[in-house]
Amino acid sequence: MIRYKAIISYDGTNFSGFQRQPQVRTVQEEIEKTLLRLNSGQAVKIHGAGRTDAGVHAYGQVIHFDLPQQRDLEKLRFGLDTQTPDDIDVIQVEQVADDFHARYQKHRKTYEFLVDLGRPKNPLMRHYATHFPYKVDFSVVKAAIKKLRGTHDFTGFTASGTSVENKVRTISRATVEKDDKTGFLIFTFTGSGFLYKQVRNMVGTLLKIGNGRMPIDQIDRILESGDRSLAGPTAASNGLYLKEIIYDD
């Protein structure tokens, strides 16, 4: 068997997430249906680096899969790209070592989160940015987000009921920028891994701090206590993008 790695992007609006689930449309299912056709009716399972939730988008999701024969890489990419639905794009395909694993190989992920501060909101971006029609002190958000950098136990920023035991993660980049032209806030987080709904919970908390309904040092309290109830609400999924995955050499 030959192992292939692919970089894909997708519009998450009409997907119930990346991972295959019964009776709903998922990214994994659509790509596996295409690979079934390209592999003469033989089933092919794909493995993704990140399991994005319903409504979450991706610029640079990474998958791997095995095929029984060597393929021309561009023809394989083209076949996948043209035979998957229009809301999936296959950007690149390459052959990798047999032991490469998209999820378990050591890597860093970068997520981006777009917040539309417009009043009224931009209707053309309703599926691609989370609307927050309240005042936000940008300087306060900028100060608060710095507290998330470094290695911490992020228990207070994950969804309750998660089965992951070790909730210590390292965030190497946590920034926020303001696009004065669009009125959007652009949050960027890079880390060694993220817990379930962690990014959305961090953004929801930062927006509440920026709106003056939480103090900046609330971040410290959440990190120290691990108490989810101290954090802000979970931001909607439509503003979240899996931007890039970089593997260690």
UniProtKB/Swiss-Prot annotation:
Assigned keywords, A-Z: Isomerase, tRNA processing
A GO BP entry: tRNA pseudouridine synthesis
Reaction catalyzed: uridine(38/39/40) in tRNA = pseudouridine(38/39/40) in tRNA
Active site (catalytic residues): D53 (nucleophile)
Known EC number: 5.4.99.12
UniProt GO molecular function: RNA binding; tRNA pseudouridine(38-40) synthase activity
Family per record: Belongs to the tRNA pseudouridine synthase TruA family.
Cited function: Formation of pseudouridine at positions 38, 39 and 40 in the anticodon stem and loop of transfer RNAs.
Protein name, entry field: tRNA pseudouridine synthase A
Species assigned in the record: Streptococcus mutans serotype c (strain ATCC 700610 / UA159)
Taxonomic lineage of the native organism: Bacteria, Bacillati, Bacillota, Bacilli, Lactobacillales
